Design a protein with these regions (language model features):
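Hydrophobic, regular-secondary-structure patches
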Residues: 1-72, 79-82, 115, 186, ...
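Peri-transmembrane interface segments
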Residues: 1, 179, 188, 192, ...
Length: 247
C-alpha cells in the first residue's frame, strides 16, 4: 500500500481483521456519518487531514457514443487529494467549495479519459453517470496496475456530497468511511486513544458501552497483507475495494 501513509487510519463500522465483537453485535453498529467527519476535522488535534468517503456501486460512464462500463467511483471530500497524494496530469481536483456543495464535477483516471476522449481533450466536457451530467475538471496521471488488479487509471473521483444527493445517507448499496491522517511524529497510541474518545463523545456513548465503530490502522492491515503477498503496489481499491474485506 504505497500511496497512503502507513499512519493513515480508516474509521468505519467494519474491522480490517479479527475482532472479539460477535457478528450479531457488529451488525447493529451504525455507519460513520458526514457529521462525525466534520466533528473530527474540527476537534481532533494533531490531525493533518480527514476525509469522508462513500463506497458506491460501480457504473457506466458515457460521452456521446463512447462509454466505459463497470467503472469504480471514488466519492470523497476534497481532503482526499492530499491524503492519498493523487497526481493530476491535466486540470485539477475539486476544491473545498465544490466538495461541500456537491458540485457535479469529476476527475477521470487515465484509461477512462483515453477511452472516452481518444482524439480530444477531456477537460470541460460533460460525461454522464448515474443518470447525471458531470463536468470533467481533471485527469489523473497514469498509475499502472495495483495489487489486486485495481488501479486509479480505471477509476474516477466525484464529490461525496454529490453522491449523497444521488444515494442518500441510508442506502444499503453504499457504506461510508472516515479517512484520517495524523500529523507526522505524534504518538500513535495516544492519538488513537484520543480519536476513540472523541468519537465516543460525539455518539454519546456511556462509560460501560463498547465502541460501536472500528478504528483501523493501515499499517497493521498492510503488515498482514505483506506477509501474504510480499511487496504491495498501489491502493486504488481503498475506496471501492473494501467490499473484499466486509462482503
Amino acid at each position: 500500500i504505497s500511496s497512503l501513509d502507513n499512519s493513515t487510519i480508516i474509521v468505519m463500522r467494519f474491522s480490517f481483521g479479527p475482532t472479539d465483537v460477535p457478528r450479531w453485535k457488529r451488525q447493529q453498529f451504525p455507519d460513520v456519518s458526514y457529521d462525525e467527519y466534520q466533528y473530527i476535522s474540527k476537534y481532533m488535534p494533531d490531525t493533518e487531514a480527514a476525509s469522508f468517503s462513500l463506497n458506491v456501486p460501480s457504473t457506466s460512464i458515457k460521452f456521446e457514443e463512447n462509454s466505459v462500463s463497470n467503472v469504480e467511483i471514488g466519492a470523497v471530500t476534497y481532503e482526499y487529494y492530499d491524503i492519498e497524494a493523487l497526481q493530476i496530469a491535466e486540470g485539477r481536483f475539486f476544491n473545498e467549495s465544490e466538495s461541500n456543495s456537491g458540485t457535479p464535477v469529476i476527475i477521470l483516471g487515465d484509461e477512462i479519459a483515453k477511452t472516452l476522449f481518444p482524439s480530444t481533450l477531456a477537460l470541460g466536457k460533460k460525461v454522464r453517470l448515474y443518470g447525471r451530467k458531470f463536468v470533467v475538471i481533471g485527469v489523473l496521471k497514469k498509475e499502472g496496475s495495483g495489487l489486486f488488479g485495481g488501479s486509479k487509471d480505471t477509476a474516477v473521483f466525484i464529490p461525496v456530497n454529490m453522491a449523497r444527493k444521488i444515494f442518500g445517507d441510508n442506502n444499503k448499496s453504499t457504506f461510508p468511511q472516515i479517512i484520517v491522517k495524523p500529523e507526522k511524529g505524534i504518538d500513535n497510541e495516544g492519538y488513537i486513544a484520543d480519536l476513540t474518545q472523541k468519537i465516543r463523545m460525539a455518539r454519546g456513548l456511556k462509560p460501560d458501552d463498547i465502541n460501536d465503530f472500528f478504528i483501523n490502522q493501515l499499517k497493521g492491515f498492510k503488515d498482514v497483507i505483506d506477509d501474504i503477498t510480499g511487496t504491495m503496489n498501489g491502493i486504488g481499491w481503498v475506496i471501492s475495494g473494501f467490499s473484499l474485506l466486509v462482503g
